[in-house]
Amino acid sequence: MANAPHGGVLKDLLVRDAALHDSLLEEARSLNDIFLTERQLCDLELILNGGFSPLEGFMDEQDYTSVVETLRLAPFNGHKYGHVFPIPITLDVSQEDINTLGLKQGARVALRDPRDDAALAILTVSDIYRPNKATEAEKVMGADDIAHPSVAYLRNNVKEFYVGGKVQAIQAPTHFDYVPLRYTPAELRAHFHKLAWRKVVAFQTRNPMHRAHRELTVRAARQRRANVLIHPVVGLTKPGDVDHYTRVRAYQALMPSYPEGMAHLALLPLAMRMAGPREAVWHAVIRKNFGATHFIVGRDHAGPGKNSQGKDFYGPYDAQELVTQFKDELQIEMVPFQAMTYLPGSDEYQPVDEVPKGTPTADISGTELRKRLRTGASIPDWFSYTGVVKVLRESYPPRPQQGFTILLTGLHNSGKDTIARALQVTLQQQGSRSVSLLLGEELRSDLDPQIGRAITPEQKHINLERIGFVAAELTKAGAAVIAAPTAPYERSRQAFKKQVVGSGGGNYFLVHVATPLEWCEKVDRRGLYKAARAGEIKNLTGVDDVYEAPENADLVCDLRIDTVPEIVHSIIMILESQNLV
């Protein structure tokens, strides 16, 4: 039979509150609303379906403080200790939210999905408290270092107050992707019962799986006469990870490689914190709630990589040690992850610590795999499966098929528009991909017709962010994007780059058209500079608004010195050096 839930009872609030659904939905219409962030949405889903049992809501100050300091919920019903729970699950709000929504002890507020405005639950406020973010970072993540993605999120995104309180469920968040693979804990437990699975080894992953992972999980199952639950995270993972759509297709391609009836794939809508040892204990609690009896804990489990000093945030086996420390209370058996390596001589995988000294081995690192995908180089069958590689190649085409964005920045009349048009023609002549031209003045009127020539600095920043969004989407689709706004501020250019690199695939190049103001004014046949100096136009860059010259442009050019064909040729050479054309 499946493992008992953490705390003894599965807190399936969706089932518990089903009889109240209509009345709760009607009440929600009259309440103030909190629209959840993506992390809060993931957290709420696992609160509602029992994945976070024994939680029944967002932590109050007593539970929060206890979790941060002791990895346990606050003691209850006369017990000396509370249940093990290593990660604080909190709902953050601002002072403005508190004032606007009338948040206070006993108040009720609707929690809504920002994607469709659906009311998911009603929270009854038990308390409002100000967390010590430095302490939370030090205790939970191990360091107050913004190189850690969760510390950066805590410092930059989390608001100044937390609201604690139990929730009543109205409905779970709606998903339209991979619906047959999404199970609540109760549903997955019922599935195990139907299949008569008594022992289940759960495998946590946020990366694509290859032959080594398959061999590891099969080995773990056979040693324990158990079945395998492949339970990948499809909520929030580490920034830069492979998107979950690609990963799930890769998992589906992998599943037929398992012996018939051995393994099952289910998706977990978890927002990871990358908290290493604490995260491993948390993952064990969650898998216990989903019915698993065993849980694989890897080397540097859920580690975020390097800190600001270039060292790992956690030791390689800290996670395994912390799970072992709580093993009696967790009541889920840890399976230590031993890295697997390929032995060409015997055509098999073995744990690295079992390979005789001097035996030839072969491995492909994540960096090498990405390089092979980028260049189109072969990926050997001993490393992965044909179906998995096919999925990855479709999502990560080689460089000549990838999109890219070139941002030309400079003063009005610096020549950037002329260069952009000439570059567009050159790339279209090559015919390898679609080419999109985003000129600043044209895009400004298209994206916001109410904005005229005399726009404020903040409007300029917002306008470039909008152009960045368009550029990122086009780049992601494989287009060549040439953007030529003035882009006068460094922070705006960095925001633009972040959008393209984060969403568009990372192929971004900055060209500074450094033609000086005197020359730009001299050739200004439209009289914009003259009008600005006469006070007829406000905030014209270079006259009464600053232009911050970029310091690290990929190319700097000046139309007084360089011809347009020479500049275009230089840009093409940059693209060729990156194997993009």
Swiss-Prot record:
Q: At which positions is sulfate bound?
A: 204, 206, 302
Q: Name one GO cellular component term.
A: cytoplasm
Q: How is its activity regulated?
A: Allosterically inhibited by 3'-phosphoadenosine 5'-phosphosulfate (PAPS).
The segment annotated N-terminal runs over: 1-176
Binding site residues for ATP: 204-207, 298-301, 340
Q: What is its EC number?
A: 2.7.7.4
Q: Which UniProt keywords apply?
A: Allosteric enzyme, Amino-acid biosynthesis, ATP-binding, Cysteine biosynthesis, Cytoplasm, Methionine biosynthesis, Nucleotide-binding, Nucleotidyltransferase, Transferase
Q: Which residues bind 3'-phosphoadenylyl sulfate?
A: 441-444, 486-487, 526
Could you say which residues are annotated as the site Transition state stabilizer? 210, 213
Annotated region described as Catalytic, given as residue ranges: 177-401
Q: Which GO terms describe its biological process?
A: cysteine biosynthetic process; hydrogen sulfide biosynthetic process; methionine biosynthetic process; sulfate assimilation via adenylyl sulfate reduction; sulfate assimilation, phosphoadenylyl sulfate reduction by phosphoadenylyl-sulfate reductase (thioredoxin)
Chain positions covered by the region annotation Allosteric regulation domain: 402-581
Q: Where in the cell is it found?
A: Cytoplasm
Q: What is its quaternary makeup?
A: Homohexamer. Dimer of trimers.
Known role: Catalyzes the first intracellular reaction of sulfate assimilation, forming adenosine-5'-phosphosulfate (APS) from inorganic sulfate and ATP. Plays an important role in sulfate activation as a component of the biosynthesis pathway of sulfur-containing amino acids.
Q: Report the domain remarks.
A: The adenylyl-sulfate kinase (APS kinase) is non-functional. It is involved in allosteric regulation by PAPS. PAPS binding induces a large rotational rearrangement of domains lowering the substrate affinity of the enzyme.
The name under which this protein is listed is: Sulfate adenylyltransferase
Underlying gene: MET3
